[in-house]
């Protein structure tokens, strides 16, 4: 049993089906639901929302965890994107509010070693740049 055993996603649409996988370890791609592909020179956004589109709850600390229910699949996707990102963009309010999961290890601690090795192989750096929007 590994830290990825409780994460099994399913790819619904693969718009980049002709593009090559970025080369993640097999267990990470299996948890993702297949090959992980990204187009070059694009900005990717990832956040959770409630059924009515709310992405943050006023006055609730770590409201995204409240909205997502702390689902390991959501944390896994966040970690995966951070493992391959050049930069993570965060608002200054979020930065001031709490220490966030700016790295893959922070987003999905159970997979820290796997994501750390994947990032080193793909990006060649320990962590993405943190870009703060003010």
Each predicted region: which residue ranges?
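Active-site ligand-binding patch in enzyme domains
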Residues: 2-51, 55-134
């Amino acid at each position: 049993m590994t830290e990825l055993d409780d994460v099994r996603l399913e790819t619904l649409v693969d718009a980049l089906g002709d593009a090559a996988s970025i080369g993640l370890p097999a267990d990470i791609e299996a948890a993702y639901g297949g090959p992980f592909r990204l187009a070059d020179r694009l900005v990717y956004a990832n956040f959770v929302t409630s059924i009515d589109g709310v992405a943050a709850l006023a006055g609730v600390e770590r409201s995204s965890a409240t909205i997502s229910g702390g689902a390991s699949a959501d944390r896994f996707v966040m970690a995966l994107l951070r493992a391959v990102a050049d930069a993570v963009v965060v608002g200054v309010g979020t930065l001031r509010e709490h220490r966030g999961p700016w790295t893959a290890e922070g987003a999905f601690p159970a997979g820290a070693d796997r994501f750390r090795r994947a990032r080193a192989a793909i990006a060649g750096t320990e962590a993405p740049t943190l870009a703060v929007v003010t």
